Amino acid sequence: GGVAEILHKMVPLMQALGLNASWEVIQGDSVFYQCTKGFHNGIQGDRVELPQSYLKAYEETNLQAAETLGETLRGADIVIIHDPQPAALVRHFAGHKGKWVWRCHIDASRPFRPVWKYLREFVHTYDASIFSLAAFARRLPHPVYLIAPSIDPLHEKNIKLGRDEIEATYSQFQVDPKRPIILQVSRFDRFKDPLGVIQSYKMAKHFLPALQLILAGGEASDDPEGEAVLDEVRMASGDDPDIKVLLLPGDAHRTINALQRCADIVLQKSLREGFGLTVAEAMWKKKPVIGGDTGGIRIQVINHHTGFTVNSPEGAALRIRYLLQNPDILTKMGEKAKAFVRENFLITRHLREYLTLFFVLLHGDQERIVLG
């Protein structure tokens, strides 16, 4: 997922700057992942049921991880814990010498109260928290910081590709480059609203009969609902030859890159969204984005400048028609979109903000700080 993509580049960059940085991963069984998927949905506002057996599996998995990672975590000056999966680790390190920070990548603006109440028991003991947007931040008894995610322009998913590779992608997935293409890249998750995307496509196709839709996503090992959603998407697609539903392997970065470059318009019609790295990825490739009016999409998609935010399939269909019928506007929006990402959402900015945070955490109580 997006968090892993960021860390794959962020950790080596920190190491290149001389920091002794490492990235540790916890492992759990299917019950653990059912529980953490429930946490994820609950933080985003779903009314979820979490049986005691799920919570027990969650706490036991974190205990086992604490035993495995104990030496590493105790010796760290700064520990950043990402999202709910390992949030309970902190309870096993009472009196820790380093600074512990909980980093929430999820839209926590309107969480399901019982889920947040349970997680808050762990989160409130951290030294600080990071959220992606001010709207996501929760009231906590420690400093809360805002750091937006980012993309790496040198990642395989974002580098320039040769024309031959892009044309091979058209061929591989039987897409006609002479006809308009709309694309959504996301895991198969109800919050990403793939069924709403299909509805939007069908409405727009009444006016643009040549329109093609690509829904591309991968399997997330920590998302037990993905297969059911994929089945629903395939059923909704029916036998329409102009809808391509692609289940891609986790390392299909160049394929996703090529698909984004193939598309005329990229959609991210999420109902809830933490940030939406696929939005920044598409904008970096000069594609206007039609996105759900939610979460981090709002700070990336600026109406009439980098794309449009919408609240319904009808709204998305209207914007698809508008852009495809006004190619000059589509091109200008794409140019603005890339410039906006360059200024705001590249990993160099993200790294700078992390380094600033580390400095504040380690030296913020000093009245005078001498550099050098």
Give residue spans per PLM region.
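Conserved donor-binding/catalytic core segment of Leloir-type glycosyltransferases
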Residues: S171-K192, I198, L213-I214
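Short alpha-helical segment that forms part of, or immediately flanks, the ligand-binding pocket
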Residues: N257, A280-W284, R298-I299, H305
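A conserved catalytic-core segment of Leloir-type glycosyltransferases
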Residues: H8-A76, R138, I147-L154
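A short, well-ordered alpha-helix in the C-terminal region of glycosyltransferases
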Residues: Y322, I329-E343, H350-T356, V360
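Short hydrophobic beta-strand element within catalytic cores of glycosyltransferases
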Residues: P288-G291, V301, T309
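Nucleotide-activated donor-binding/catalytic signature segment of Leloir-type glycosyltransferases, i.e.
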Residues: G217-A258
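Aromatic "clamp/platform" in nucleotide-sugar-dependent glycosyltransferases that forms part
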Residues: L271
